[in-house]
C-alpha cells in the first residue's frame, strides 16, 4: 500500500512540474527545478574519525554529521544514521544504526583480533539518501548466472553514488605494546587471482568539457589512464590522431594519470583516436563520437567564474530560449540567459559570491528541457581557508601518563557554533594521504 501511495504522489508531482504544458521557457524550468530541490532536499553525510590509520586491535571512534542541501544546516529529516565497516574484500564486518536527534551521531567499531590488515572502507548513509544516485555496477551478463535468481543479482550489483565512503589502512597488530610499525600482511589473493601475462589491460577514459565533442568547435578534453587494477599511470605520452592518421596534438599524463588537451575545429563525423606505448606494447583507443549539433564549454575561475560557450554551425534557433544554470547540492544558485545573436561564441561571467563553495554543476539547456552541455566545477570562495579555532597549550614532548591541558578559542566571536568535534592522535603514526 505504501508503494502505491508513493507512486501516486510521484505521478501527481511529475504532472505539476512537467505535465501542464509540453514546452515551457527556461525561467519556468528554473523555478520548477528550484522548487524540486526545496521540496525534495538531499542529505549529505560526513564522518569525523579519530585517526588517519589504525592497527588490528584498535577502536575506530567517529562522529557523524548529516546536512540538508536546501538550507546547508544539520538535517531535521532523517533520525537514523547507518554506518557500515567493510573488509578489503568487500564483506560487511558490522552495520550500526545510530539515533540522530539533532543531525549528529557518534559511534565506534572495534577492530578485533580476528580481522586482518588491509584497506578497509567506512560507508555512511540515511534511508532518505537511498532515493538518489542509484546505479548498477558494470558487470558481464554471465556473472549473474552465479545467483539463484535475477533479483539476487540485482541486489548484489546495486550501489549508490551519494553515500559517504572513505577508505583507510589497517596495519598488523604490534608485536610489542607501544611499538607501532606500519606492517600490512595482506591476504594471499594471488591464490584466487593470477596476474595476466602478456599485454596489460589498460583503461583510458575521455571527458570532453561540456560532455561531448561538438563539430565545428574547439573542445577541451580531459583523460585518465589506469591499469586494470586501478593503478594511475603517470608520465605516459599520448598522441591524438585524426582519421587520416596525422598527429594533431599530444599530451602527457601527470598526477593520478590525468591530463588535458585541446581539439581545434572538431571535424564532422570524424573519428579521432589516441595512441601510446606502455611497457613496449602499442595501444590505440578511439575518442568519443563527434556530435553534429551542440554547445562546447570552457570554464575558468579567478575572481569570477568565466564560462565560454561555442555553438556548432547548424545550431542557430532556440525558439524556447537558452539558459545557463549553476546548481550546488541540488539547489539552483543562479540562472543566466544566453543569446548568441549572429555569433558562434559568447561569454558568461558569474561573481563567486553568488555561488557556494564546493562542487557546482553547470548546465546549458533550452525551454524544452534539452541539455546541450553539462559540467562539474569546484568553486572556492576561500571561506573555509583559515582555521576558525585556535589551540594553545600543546607541548613538544610529554612524559608517560602526564596530564594534558589544551585551550581552545573560537576566532569568530559571532559564530553560532556550539559544539566541537575534537580528535587527538599520535603524530608518529599519522597517514597524510588518508587524513580528514
What are these regions (language model features)?
Residues 115-116, 126-142, 278-284, 331, ...:
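Short acidic/polar inter-strand loop motif in beta-rich domains
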Residues 33-44, 179-182, 191-202, 283-289, ...:
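Proline/serine/threonine-rich low-complexity linkers at boundaries of modular beta-sandwich domains
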Residues 106-117, 129, 258-269, 314, ...:
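Short, surface-exposed loop/turn segments at beta-strand-coil junctions that are enriched for proline
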Residues 101-108, 254-260, 334-335, 341-349:
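Aromatic sugar-binding surface patches on proteins
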Residues 43-71, 204-231, 303-311, 363, ...:
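Beta-strand-rich structural segments
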Residues 76-86, 96, 107, 118-124, ...:
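Beta-strand-rich binding/interaction modules
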Residues 1-28, 408:
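Bacterial Sec-dependent N-terminal signal peptides
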Amino acid at each position: 500500500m505504501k508503494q502505491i501511495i508513493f507512486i501516486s504522489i510521484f505521478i501527481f508531482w511529475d504532472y505539476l512540474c512537467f505535465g501542464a504544458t509540453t514546452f515551457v521557457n527556461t525561467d519556468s524550468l528554473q523555478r520548477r527545478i528550484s522548487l524540486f530541490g526545496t521540496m525534495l532536499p538531499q542529505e549529505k553525510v560526513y564522518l569525523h574519525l579519530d585517526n588517519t590509520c589504525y592497527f588490528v586491535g584498535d577502536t575506530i571512534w567517529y562522529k557523524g554529521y548529516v546536512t540538508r542541501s536546501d538550507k546547508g544546516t544539520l538535517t531535521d529529516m532523517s533520525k537514523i544514521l547507518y554506518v557500515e565497516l567493510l573488509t578489503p574484500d568487500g564483506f560487511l564486518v558490522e552495520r550500526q544504526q545510530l539515533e540522530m536527534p539533532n543531525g549528529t551521531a557518534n559511534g565506534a567499531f572495534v577492530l578485533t583480533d580476528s580481522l586482518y590488515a588491509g584497506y578497509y572502507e567506512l560507508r555512511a548513509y540515511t534511508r532518505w539518501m537511498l532515493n538518489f544516485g542509484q546505479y548498477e555496477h558494470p558487470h558481464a551478463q554471465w556473472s549473474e548466472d552465479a545467483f539463484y535468481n535475477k533479483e539476487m543479482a540485482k541486489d548484489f550489483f546495486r550501489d549508490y553514488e551519494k553515500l559517504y565512503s572513505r577508505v583507510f589502512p589497517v596495519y598488523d597488530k604490534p608485536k610489542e605494546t607501544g611499538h607501532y610499525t606500519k606492517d600490512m600482511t595482506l591476504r594471499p589473493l594471488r591464490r584466487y587471482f593470477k596476474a595476466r601475462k602478456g599485454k596489460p589491460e589498460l583503461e583510458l577514459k575521455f571527458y570532453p568539457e561540456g560532455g561531448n565533442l561538438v563539430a565545428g568547435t574547439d573542445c577541451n578534453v580531459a583523460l585518465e589512464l589506469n591499469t586494470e587494477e586501478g593503478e594511475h599511470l603517470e608520465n605516459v605520452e599520448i598522441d591524438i590522431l585524426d582519421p587520416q592518421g596525422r598527429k594533431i596534438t599530444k599530451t602527457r599524463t601527470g598526477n593520478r594519470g590525468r591530463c588535458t588537451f585541446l581539439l581545434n575545429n572538431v571535424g564532422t563525423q570524424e573519428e579521432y583516436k589516441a595512441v601510446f606505448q606502455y611497457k613496449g606494447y602499442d595501444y590505440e583507443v578511439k575518442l568519443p563520437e563527434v556530435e553534429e549539433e551542440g554547445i562546447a564549454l570552457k570554464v575558468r575561475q579567478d575572481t569570477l567564474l568565466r564560462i565560454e560557450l561555442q555553438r556548432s554551425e547548424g545550431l542557430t534557433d532556440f525558439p524556447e530560449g537558452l539558459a545557463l544554470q549553476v546548481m550546488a547540492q541540488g539547489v539552483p544558485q543562479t540562472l543566466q540567459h544566453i543569446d548568441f545573436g549572429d555569433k558562434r561564441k559568447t561569454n558568461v561571467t558569474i561573481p563567486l559570491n553568488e555561488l557556494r563553495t564546493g562542487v557546482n554543476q553547470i548546465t546549458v539547456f533550452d525551454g524544452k528541457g534539452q541539455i546541450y552541455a553539462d559540467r562539474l566545477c569546484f568553486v572556492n570562495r576561500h571561506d573555509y581557508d583559515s582555521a576558525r579555532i585556535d589551540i594553545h597549550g600543546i607541548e613538544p614532548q610529554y612524559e608517560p601518563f602526564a596530564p594534558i591541558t589544551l585551550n581552545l578559542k573560537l576566532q569568530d566571536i559571532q559564530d553560532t557554533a556550539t559544539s566541537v568535534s575534537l580528535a587527538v592522535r599520535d603524530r608518529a603514526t599519522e597517514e597524510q594521504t588518508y587524513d580528514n
